[in-house]
Design a protein with these regions (language model features):
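Radical SAM enzyme core and accessory elements
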Residues: 226-228, 264-322
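Short, solvent-exposed loop/turn segments at secondary-structure junctions
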Residues: 29, 59-60, 83, 124-125, ...
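C-terminal accessory region of radical SAM enzymes
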Residues: 168-203, 233-279
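Radical SAM enzyme [4Fe-4S]-AdoMet core and its adjacent flexible, acidic
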Residues: 93-101, 108-212, 216, 225
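Radical SAM/AdoMet-radical enzyme domain recognition
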Residues: 3-25, 32-152
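Short acidic/His/Gly/Ser-rich catalytic and metal-binding motifs that mark active-site loops
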Residues: 84-88, 156-159, 281
Protein backbone atom coordinates (compact mmCIF):
# COMPACT_ATOMS: atom_id res chain seq x y z
CA UNK A 1 0.00 0.00 0.00
CA UNK A 2 1.28 3.47 -0.88
CA UNK A 3 1.22 6.40 1.51
CA UNK A 4 -1.27 8.22 -0.72
CA UNK A 5 -3.67 5.26 -0.58
CA UNK A 6 -3.29 4.99 3.19
CA UNK A 7 -3.85 8.72 3.70
CA UNK A 8 -6.97 8.69 1.55
CA UNK A 9 -8.33 5.73 3.53
CA UNK A 10 -7.80 7.53 6.84
CA UNK A 11 -9.32 10.76 5.54
CA UNK A 12 -12.34 8.87 4.23
CA UNK A 13 -12.92 7.17 7.59
CA UNK A 14 -12.52 10.51 9.37
CA UNK A 15 -15.09 12.28 7.20
CA UNK A 16 -17.87 11.62 9.68
CA UNK A 17 -15.83 13.25 12.47
CA UNK A 18 -16.83 10.41 14.80
CA UNK A 19 -14.45 8.08 16.68
CA UNK A 20 -13.54 4.94 14.73
CA UNK A 21 -11.20 1.97 14.90
CA UNK A 22 -8.29 1.83 12.46
CA UNK A 23 -7.25 -1.83 12.27
CA UNK A 24 -3.94 -2.78 10.68
CA UNK A 25 -4.00 -6.35 9.42
CA UNK A 26 -2.72 -8.36 6.53
CA UNK A 27 -0.87 -10.33 5.47
CA UNK A 28 1.61 -9.11 8.02
CA UNK A 29 1.32 -5.35 8.68
CA UNK A 30 4.76 -5.07 10.29
CA UNK A 31 6.31 -5.75 6.89
CA UNK A 32 5.19 -2.19 6.12
CA UNK A 33 6.60 -0.61 9.28
CA UNK A 34 7.62 2.71 7.61
CA UNK A 35 4.06 3.12 6.32
CA UNK A 36 2.65 2.33 9.77
CA UNK A 37 4.83 5.08 11.21
CA UNK A 38 3.50 7.56 8.65
CA UNK A 39 -0.09 6.58 9.34
CA UNK A 40 0.30 6.81 13.11
CA UNK A 41 2.02 10.20 12.82
CA UNK A 42 -0.73 11.43 10.52
CA UNK A 43 -3.52 10.34 12.86
CA UNK A 44 -1.80 12.02 15.78
CA UNK A 45 -0.82 15.25 13.99
CA UNK A 46 -4.31 15.71 12.53
CA UNK A 47 -5.93 14.79 15.85
CA UNK A 48 -8.10 12.23 14.10
CA UNK A 49 -10.35 10.42 16.62
CA UNK A 50 -9.14 6.94 15.73
CA UNK A 51 -8.18 4.05 17.97
CA UNK A 52 -5.38 2.17 16.25
CA UNK A 53 -5.08 -1.62 16.57
CA UNK A 54 -2.70 -4.04 14.91
CA UNK A 55 -2.94 -7.80 14.37
CA UNK A 56 0.44 -9.43 13.86
CA UNK A 57 1.86 -12.93 13.55
CA UNK A 58 4.47 -11.83 16.10
CA UNK A 59 7.61 -12.82 14.23
CA UNK A 60 8.83 -9.28 13.50
CA UNK A 61 8.50 -7.77 16.98
CA UNK A 62 11.88 -6.18 17.71
CA UNK A 63 12.81 -3.67 20.41
CA UNK A 64 12.57 -0.87 17.84
CA UNK A 65 9.13 -1.99 16.71
CA UNK A 66 7.87 -2.42 20.26
CA UNK A 67 9.05 1.08 21.19
CA UNK A 68 7.24 2.56 18.20
CA UNK A 69 4.00 0.69 18.96
CA UNK A 70 4.06 1.85 22.57
CA UNK A 71 4.71 5.49 21.69
CA UNK A 72 2.05 5.40 18.97
CA UNK A 73 -0.41 3.83 21.42
CA UNK A 74 -1.34 1.10 18.98
CA UNK A 75 -3.20 -1.82 20.52
CA UNK A 76 -1.64 -5.17 19.68
CA UNK A 77 -3.11 -8.57 18.97
CA UNK A 78 -0.76 -11.49 18.36
CA UNK A 79 -1.75 -14.69 16.59
CA UNK A 80 -0.96 -17.82 18.60
CA UNK A 81 -2.64 -21.09 17.72
CA UNK A 82 -1.59 -23.20 20.70
CA UNK A 83 1.41 -24.35 22.69
CA UNK A 84 4.69 -24.17 20.70
CA UNK A 85 4.41 -27.64 19.15
CA UNK A 86 0.81 -27.04 18.08
CA UNK A 87 1.55 -23.55 16.76
CA UNK A 88 4.60 -24.75 14.82
CA UNK A 89 2.57 -27.44 13.09
CA UNK A 90 0.18 -24.76 11.82
CA UNK A 91 2.39 -21.71 11.22
CA UNK A 92 5.77 -22.23 9.59
CA UNK A 93 8.34 -20.20 7.70
CA UNK A 94 8.80 -21.04 3.99
CA UNK A 95 11.74 -23.31 4.90
CA UNK A 96 9.53 -25.38 7.21
CA UNK A 97 10.79 -24.01 10.53
CA UNK A 98 8.13 -23.32 13.13
CA UNK A 99 7.52 -19.73 14.19
CA UNK A 100 6.57 -20.24 17.85
CA UNK A 101 9.99 -19.41 19.32
CA UNK A 102 10.10 -16.09 17.46
CA UNK A 103 6.50 -15.29 18.42
CA UNK A 104 7.23 -15.89 22.11
CA UNK A 105 10.42 -13.81 21.85
CA UNK A 106 8.42 -11.01 20.25
CA UNK A 107 5.78 -11.09 22.97
CA UNK A 108 8.51 -10.94 25.61
CA UNK A 109 9.99 -7.95 23.81
CA UNK A 110 6.62 -6.22 24.13
CA UNK A 111 6.51 -7.14 27.81
CA UNK A 112 9.90 -5.50 28.36
CA UNK A 113 8.39 -2.31 26.91
CA UNK A 114 5.43 -2.56 29.29
CA UNK A 115 2.97 -3.46 26.54
CA UNK A 116 0.00 -5.70 27.24
CA UNK A 117 -1.50 -7.64 24.35
CA UNK A 118 -4.36 -9.83 23.25
CA UNK A 119 -3.89 -13.30 21.81
CA UNK A 120 -5.98 -14.46 18.86
CA UNK A 121 -6.27 -18.14 18.02
CA UNK A 122 -7.61 -19.36 14.69
CA UNK A 123 -9.53 -22.53 15.51
CA UNK A 124 -9.44 -25.46 13.09
CA UNK A 125 -9.92 -29.21 13.30
CA UNK A 126 -6.16 -29.47 13.85
CA UNK A 127 -5.95 -27.46 17.07
CA UNK A 128 -9.45 -27.43 18.57
CA UNK A 129 -8.54 -30.14 21.10
CA UNK A 130 -5.57 -28.05 22.28
CA UNK A 131 -7.22 -24.67 22.94
CA UNK A 132 -6.67 -24.82 26.69
CA UNK A 133 -2.97 -24.64 25.86
CA UNK A 134 -3.51 -21.10 24.61
CA UNK A 135 -4.85 -20.14 28.04
CA UNK A 136 -1.78 -21.71 29.66
CA UNK A 137 0.47 -19.72 27.35
CA UNK A 138 -1.43 -16.52 28.12
CA UNK A 139 -0.83 -16.88 31.86
CA UNK A 140 2.76 -18.00 31.30
CA UNK A 141 3.67 -15.02 29.13
CA UNK A 142 2.45 -12.55 31.74
CA UNK A 143 1.55 -9.57 29.57
CA UNK A 144 -1.55 -11.05 27.94
CA UNK A 145 -4.78 -9.36 29.01
CA UNK A 146 -7.22 -11.12 26.70
CA UNK A 147 -7.61 -14.29 24.64
CA UNK A 148 -9.96 -14.61 21.67
CA UNK A 149 -10.90 -17.59 19.53
CA UNK A 150 -11.62 -17.02 15.84
CA UNK A 151 -13.05 -19.96 13.94
CA UNK A 152 -11.57 -20.61 10.53
CA UNK A 153 -13.23 -18.80 7.64
CA UNK A 154 -12.73 -21.07 4.60
CA UNK A 155 -11.67 -18.48 2.04
CA UNK A 156 -8.32 -18.27 0.26
CA UNK A 157 -5.69 -20.46 1.94
CA UNK A 158 -8.26 -21.38 4.59
CA UNK A 159 -10.30 -23.30 2.03
CA UNK A 160 -7.82 -26.19 2.25
CA UNK A 161 -8.01 -26.44 6.06
CA UNK A 162 -10.56 -28.54 7.91
CA UNK A 163 -13.03 -26.69 10.12
CA UNK A 164 -13.64 -27.70 13.74
CA UNK A 165 -16.78 -29.69 14.55
CA UNK A 166 -19.42 -28.27 16.87
CA UNK A 167 -19.10 -31.06 19.44
CA UNK A 168 -15.32 -30.62 19.57
CA UNK A 169 -15.72 -26.85 19.93
CA UNK A 170 -18.11 -27.24 22.86
CA UNK A 171 -15.78 -29.66 24.62
CA UNK A 172 -12.76 -27.45 23.99
CA UNK A 173 -14.41 -24.34 25.40
CA UNK A 174 -15.53 -26.23 28.50
CA UNK A 175 -11.87 -27.10 29.07
CA UNK A 176 -10.79 -23.51 28.33
CA UNK A 177 -13.17 -21.99 30.86
CA UNK A 178 -12.40 -24.61 33.52
CA UNK A 179 -8.67 -23.97 33.18
CA UNK A 180 -9.17 -20.21 33.20
CA UNK A 181 -11.11 -20.48 36.46
CA UNK A 182 -8.40 -22.68 37.98
CA UNK A 183 -5.49 -20.46 36.93
CA UNK A 184 -7.45 -17.38 37.95
CA UNK A 185 -7.79 -18.75 41.48
CA UNK A 186 -4.11 -19.69 41.59
CA UNK A 187 -2.82 -16.35 40.34
CA UNK A 188 -5.51 -13.98 41.60
CA UNK A 189 -5.94 -12.73 38.04
CA UNK A 190 -8.59 -14.11 35.70
CA UNK A 191 -7.83 -13.87 31.99
CA UNK A 192 -10.42 -12.06 29.87
CA UNK A 193 -11.92 -14.19 27.11
CA UNK A 194 -13.20 -12.10 24.19
CA UNK A 195 -16.26 -14.27 23.56
CA UNK A 196 -17.30 -13.98 27.22
CA UNK A 197 -16.95 -10.21 27.11
CA UNK A 198 -19.11 -10.07 24.00
CA UNK A 199 -21.74 -12.30 25.60
CA UNK A 200 -21.86 -10.12 28.71
CA UNK A 201 -22.23 -7.00 26.55
CA UNK A 202 -25.01 -8.49 24.43
CA UNK A 203 -26.87 -9.62 27.54
CA UNK A 204 -27.39 -5.94 28.36
CA UNK A 205 -28.66 -4.81 24.96
CA UNK A 206 -32.28 -4.01 24.22
CA UNK A 207 -32.26 -4.70 20.46
CA UNK A 208 -32.25 -8.05 18.73
CA UNK A 209 -30.61 -7.46 15.35
CA UNK A 210 -27.36 -8.80 13.91
CA UNK A 211 -24.49 -7.40 15.93
CA UNK A 212 -21.70 -9.90 15.30
CA UNK A 213 -20.46 -8.35 12.07
CA UNK A 214 -19.82 -4.71 11.16
CA UNK A 215 -20.28 -5.53 7.47
CA UNK A 216 -23.81 -6.82 8.10
CA UNK A 217 -24.67 -3.45 9.59
CA UNK A 218 -22.77 -1.28 7.13
CA UNK A 219 -20.58 -0.14 10.00
CA UNK A 220 -17.19 -1.35 8.83
CA UNK A 221 -15.16 -1.84 5.65
CA UNK A 222 -11.82 -3.29 4.54
CA UNK A 223 -9.34 -1.40 2.36
CA UNK A 224 -6.90 -3.52 0.37
CA UNK A 225 -3.37 -2.54 -0.66
CA UNK A 226 -4.62 -0.98 -3.90
CA UNK A 227 -7.22 1.18 -2.17
CA UNK A 228 -10.26 -0.89 -3.10
CA UNK A 229 -12.95 -0.99 -0.43
CA UNK A 230 -14.72 -4.24 0.42
CA UNK A 231 -17.50 -5.07 2.83
CA UNK A 232 -15.33 -7.67 4.57
CA UNK A 233 -11.68 -8.73 4.53
CA UNK A 234 -12.76 -12.28 3.67
CA UNK A 235 -13.98 -11.13 0.26
CA UNK A 236 -11.04 -9.10 -1.02
CA UNK A 237 -10.86 -9.56 -4.78
CA UNK A 238 -14.54 -10.51 -5.08
CA UNK A 239 -16.23 -7.81 -7.16
CA UNK A 240 -19.61 -8.70 -5.69
CA UNK A 241 -18.51 -7.27 -2.34
CA UNK A 242 -16.64 -4.26 -3.77
CA UNK A 243 -18.06 -1.04 -2.31
CA UNK A 244 -15.79 1.57 -3.89
CA UNK A 245 -12.26 2.84 -3.48
CA UNK A 246 -10.43 5.42 -1.40
CA UNK A 247 -10.38 7.98 -4.23
CA UNK A 248 -14.10 7.97 -5.08
CA UNK A 249 -15.42 6.84 -1.71
CA UNK A 250 -18.03 4.27 -0.72
CA UNK A 251 -21.14 3.54 -2.75
CA UNK A 252 -23.56 3.85 0.17
CA UNK A 253 -26.43 2.25 -1.71
CA UNK A 254 -24.30 -0.76 -2.62
CA UNK A 255 -23.11 -1.00 0.98
CA UNK A 256 -26.73 -1.17 2.16
CA UNK A 257 -27.56 -3.79 -0.47
CA UNK A 258 -24.64 -5.99 0.55
CA UNK A 259 -25.49 -5.66 4.24
CA UNK A 260 -29.10 -6.64 3.54
CA UNK A 261 -27.98 -9.55 1.39
CA UNK A 262 -25.81 -10.82 4.22
CA UNK A 263 -28.63 -10.51 6.74
CA UNK A 264 -31.05 -12.30 4.42
CA UNK A 265 -28.61 -15.17 3.95
CA UNK A 266 -28.31 -15.51 7.73
CA UNK A 267 -32.05 -15.27 8.38
CA UNK A 268 -32.02 -18.72 9.98
CA UNK A 269 -30.22 -17.13 12.95
CA UNK A 270 -33.39 -15.18 13.79
CA UNK A 271 -35.26 -18.42 14.53
CA UNK A 272 -32.79 -19.36 17.26
CA UNK A 273 -33.75 -18.76 20.89
CA UNK A 274 -30.24 -17.44 21.56
CA UNK A 275 -30.21 -14.87 18.75
CA UNK A 276 -30.62 -11.75 20.88
CA UNK A 277 -27.82 -12.87 23.20
CA UNK A 278 -25.62 -14.06 20.33
CA UNK A 279 -25.89 -11.37 17.66
CA UNK A 280 -25.86 -13.83 14.78
CA UNK A 281 -23.23 -15.94 13.09
CA UNK A 282 -20.50 -14.98 10.62
CA UNK A 283 -21.71 -14.61 7.03
CA UNK A 284 -18.25 -15.19 5.53
CA UNK A 285 -17.83 -18.47 7.37
CA UNK A 286 -21.19 -19.76 6.13
CA UNK A 287 -20.60 -18.49 2.58
CA UNK A 288 -17.32 -20.35 2.44
CA UNK A 289 -19.03 -23.69 3.10
CA UNK A 290 -22.44 -22.97 1.59
CA UNK A 291 -24.84 -24.33 4.19
CA UNK A 292 -26.26 -23.31 7.61
CA UNK A 293 -24.48 -26.21 9.35
CA UNK A 294 -21.23 -24.34 8.67
CA UNK A 295 -22.19 -22.11 11.61
CA UNK A 296 -22.64 -24.99 14.08
CA UNK A 297 -19.16 -24.72 15.59
CA UNK A 298 -19.57 -20.97 15.99
CA UNK A 299 -22.91 -21.54 17.70
CA UNK A 300 -21.25 -24.00 20.08
CA UNK A 301 -18.51 -21.47 20.85
CA UNK A 302 -20.98 -18.68 21.56
CA UNK A 303 -23.30 -20.86 23.65
CA UNK A 304 -20.37 -21.94 25.80
CA UNK A 305 -19.34 -18.31 26.25
CA UNK A 306 -22.89 -17.24 27.12
CA UNK A 307 -23.15 -20.03 29.69
CA UNK A 308 -19.84 -19.14 31.30
CA UNK A 309 -20.65 -15.43 31.30
CA UNK A 310 -23.96 -16.14 33.03
CA UNK A 311 -22.26 -18.36 35.61
CA UNK A 312 -19.74 -15.62 36.39
CA UNK A 313 -22.54 -13.05 36.77
CA UNK A 314 -24.46 -15.36 39.12
CA UNK A 315 -21.40 -15.97 41.28
CA UNK A 316 -20.67 -12.25 41.37
CA UNK A 317 -24.24 -11.50 42.47
CA UNK A 318 -23.98 -14.10 45.21
CA UNK A 319 -20.81 -12.52 46.54
CA UNK A 320 -22.36 -9.06 46.56
CA UNK A 321 -25.67 -10.26 48.00
CA UNK A 322 -27.75 -9.19 44.99
Amino acid sequence: MTWETARRAIDLAATGKMPFILQFAGGEPLLALPLLRQMADYVRSKRIPARMDLQTNGTLLTEETATFLRRARIGIGVSLDGRPAVHDALRCYPDGRGTAADVVAGIRQLAQCGIEIGLTTVVTADNVAELSGVVEMAYYLGNVRRVGFDLLRPQGRGSAVRSARAEDMAQAMEAVFALNRKLGRMTGHSMAISQMEQAACLAQRTGSGFSHCHAMNGAGVHVDALGNIYACSSFVGDAHFLLGDVERGIDVQRQKEVAQEMQNAMAFCRTCADFSACGGACYARRAGQGHPAASDAECALKRAAMKESLNVAVQCNKRTGQ
